[in-house]
Curated annotation (Swiss-Prot):
InterPro entries linked: PyrdxlP-dep_Trfase (IPR015424), PyrdxlP-dep_Trfase_major (IPR015421), PyrdxlP-dep_Trfase_small (IPR015422), Ser_HO-MeTrfase (IPR001085), Ser_HO-MeTrfase-like (IPR049943), Ser_HO-MeTrfase_PLP_BS (IPR019798), SHMT-like_dom (IPR039429)
Catalysed transformations (reactions): (6R)-5,10-methylene-5,6,7,8-tetrahydrofolate + glycine + H2O = (6S)-5,6,7,8-tetrahydrofolate + L-serine
Species annotation: Sorangium cellulosum (strain So ce56)
Positions contributing to (6S)-5,6,7,8-tetrahydrofolate binding: 126, 130-132
Primary localization: cytoplasm
Known role: Catalyzes the reversible interconversion of serine and glycine with tetrahydrofolate (THF) serving as the one-carbon carrier. This reaction serves as the major source of one-carbon groups required for the biosynthesis of purines, thymidylate, methionine, and other important biomolecules. Also exhibits THF-independent aldolase activity toward beta-hydroxyamino acids, producing glycine and aldehydes, via a retro-aldol mechanism.
Enzyme Commission number: 2.1.2.1
Residues under site feature: Plays an important role in substrate specificity: 234
Keyword Cytoplasm: yes
Keywords: Amino-acid biosynthesis, Cytoplasm, One-carbon metabolism, Pyridoxal phosphate, Transferase
Protein's name according to its UniProt entry: Serine hydroxymethyltransferase
Length: 423
């Protein structure tokens, strides 16, 4: 083996690092042979994968298009401009920034743009379905700001807008978040806007979970209502692991300055390219049909589970996810999620509103339909899935039965090939 080939990196992955190559192969097989119900996961297209793994990862590009600190940006500037203009057109936004590395940095940029340390902020509490970065105590956002969390009603587990209004009037927050990670109902952005206006707060909408549904017109859009909108670019958007910030024209300078140089250095250009590809895909009619089917499947799965004795938080869903209280089934969320995983059905245990159990061993399970819908599955498959989930719930310790279900799941998966995976 020549020194030149060693230094130049001419060898393939399976030659250089067979251990990592084998782990990737095993992950491809796992993703192909299991039903992925984690609401924040999805399959990206082959085109998105190709962009993510491109030579654009080699280029450093501090700054913004045509205002860089490095030369050699001829292609990169065009890539970023395409990503920004495609996202702006898709959502009807005045201004777009596609440089945040992920959802949490995007949210931190919003704080940097609009708030000072110790300012009061409001967001949905984590136990009620909110996100860590909306001011929860263990997050840096809960340590650097005075966080006033709002919640959901105990009667129906829907966001308590009366409480939001009362808390806003009492605490006069600088910033109000409306966004969720485990909330299956439509968000009333206009109601949040009215509350923010009453107290003079900036309204920030975090649509990380529902961006694909918003882009397709399946969920109401906060663009033009909220001052600023953040989102990851994976989940229902089916893009790479990145993020984007959409805002009104008057906030463009503050947002861009907060992202760079406020929080980050050079953007990940390979991710930017993949965001551009995902935005192009999301603009097509096929994506709109796909987004509609996500919701149809989630509602069908919810009905099928409810008919089998599962208790759905809020009684159903308007979007891509379901939150389930496992108490009536006599099993906690964690052991149930682990049993499902052995059966080839991948979900995550999750706290439910007013959960008496601890977060690492909660009462609930969160599931979503983006990934199974990406495989082309429909209502009939949701019925089969509910039957398997019920069988597992009743036979958590029956490993022979669970192994049989796993084999049946793998057989179903072979009929619906996973996008982007070539075995």
């Amino acid at each position: 083996m020549s020194v030149t080939s060693e230094v130049q990196g001419l060898r393939a992955l399976n030659e250089v690092d067979p251990e990592i190559a084998e782990l990737i192969r095993l992950e491809e097989r796992r993703e192909a042979d299991t039903l992925r119900l984690i609401a924040s996961e999805n399959y990206v297209s082959r085109a998105v994968l190709e962009a993510t793994g491109s030579v654009l990862t080699n280029k450093y590009s501090e700054g913004y298009p045509h205002k860089r600190y490095y030369e050699g940006q001829q292609q990169v500037d065009v890539v970023e401009e395409l990503a920004r203009t495609r996202v702006a057109k898709l959502f009807g936004a005045d201004h777009v920034n596609v440089q945040p590395y992920s959802g949490s940095p995007a949210n931190l940029a919003v704080y940097l743009a609009f708030a000072q340390a110790n300012d009061t902020i409001m967001g949905l509490g984590l136990p009620a379905g909110g996100h860590l970065t909306h001011g929860w105590s263990v997050s840096i956002t809960g340590k650097y700001f005075k966080s006033v969390p709002y919640g959901v009603r105990e009667s129906d587990h829907r966001i308590d807008l009366d409480q939001v209004r009362d808390l806003a009037r009492a605490h006069r927050p600088k910033l109000i978040w409306c966004g969720t990670t485990a909330y299956p109902r439509t968000l009333d952005f206009a109601a949040f806007r009215a509350i923010a206006d009453e107290v003079g707060a900036i309204l920030a909408a975090d649509i990380a979970h529902i961006a694909g549904l918003v882009a397709a017109g399946v969920h109401p859009s906060p663009v033009g209502i909220a001052d600023v909108v953040t989102s990851t670019t994976h989940k229902t958007f089916r893009g790479p692991r990145g993020a984007m910030i959409l805002c009104k024209k008057e906030h463009a300078g503050a947002i861009d300055k907060a992202v760079f140089p406020g929080l980050q250095g050079g953007p990940h250009n390979h991710t930017t390219a993949a965001i551009a590809v995902a935005a192009k895909e999301a603009s097509e009619e096929g994506f709109r049909a796909y987004a509609r089917q996500i919701v149809v499947n989630a509602q069908a799965l919810g009905r099928a589970l409810e008919s089998r004795g599962f208790r759905l938080i809020t009684g159903g869903t308007d979007n891509h996810l379901l939150l389930i209280d496992m108490t009536p089934k006599g099993i906690a969320g964690k052991p149930y999620a682990q049993a499902l995983d052995r059966a080839g059905i991948v979900a995550n245990y999750n706290s439910i509103p007013f959960d008496p159990r601890k977060p690492f061993d909660p009462s609930g399970l969160r599931i979503g339909t983006p990934a199974v819908t990406s495989r082309g599955m429909g209502v009939a498959e949701m019925e089969r899935l509910a039957a398997w989930m019920d069988e597992v719930a009743q036979n958590v310790n029956d490993e022979a039965r669970i192994a049989r279900i796993a084999a049946e799941v793998a057989e179903l998966c072979r009929g619906f090939p996973a996008p982007g995976i070539r075995l």
